[in-house]
């Protein structure tokens, strides 16, 4: 990748790097764009780019994957499991890689007109993916490792706010959201 916004080589823990390296390798082989979102993106940006220690650390990695439909998502899931390093969990979006939990969240053409996804086969679990496309479009590329090279996209702090997580950002910065009407 070109246009590295930050070089964070040597700043992430090896299990996280191993997980992201394999995830990205599999996604790239299937031409599936991905980016780190949620608290994991927040923590990487605040801690390693700006030197701000998060008040609460996240216990998982959240990834957005741009897929055309459920067949492409299933292909990604099966390919991850086929590596022998990823294991499914009872939650449809969640996988385990060693001790690390990964939530893989599909967005893009897979969503309906309201930007929602409905998880098969029952389609009873519904998630809003509002803001994911915009967050991906304005994501930054960071180098997490130089050897082997691991360049990955991260949602920016404004992207996290677009995604509806301003409270997460305020808490991370040690601030409190304003009270309604105040």
Name what the model sees in each region.
Residues 1-182:
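Compositionally biased terminal segments of proteins
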């Amino acid at each position: 990748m070109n246009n590295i916004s930050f070089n964070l080589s040597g700043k992430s823990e090896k299990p996280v790097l191993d997980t992201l390296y394999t995830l990205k390798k599999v996604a790239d082989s299937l031409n599936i764009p991905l980016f780190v979102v949620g608290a994991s993106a927040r923590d990487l940006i605040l801690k390693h780019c700006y030197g701000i220690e998060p008040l609460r650390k996240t216990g998982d990695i959240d990834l957005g994957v741009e897929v055309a439909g459920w067949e492409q998502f299933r292909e990604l899931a099966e390919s991850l499991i086929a590596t022998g390093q990823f294991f499914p969990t009872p939650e449809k979006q969640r996988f385990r890689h060693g001790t690390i939990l990964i939530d893989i969240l599909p967005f893009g053409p897979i969503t309906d007109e309201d930007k929602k996804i409905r998880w098969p086969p029952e389609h009873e679990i519904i998630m809003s993916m509002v803001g994911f496309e915009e967050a991906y479009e304005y994501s930054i590329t960071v180098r997490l490792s130089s050897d082997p090279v691991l360049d990955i996209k991260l949602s920016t702090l404004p992207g996290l706010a677009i995604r509806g997580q301003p409270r997460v950002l305020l808490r991370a910065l040690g601030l409190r959201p304003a009270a309604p009407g105040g």
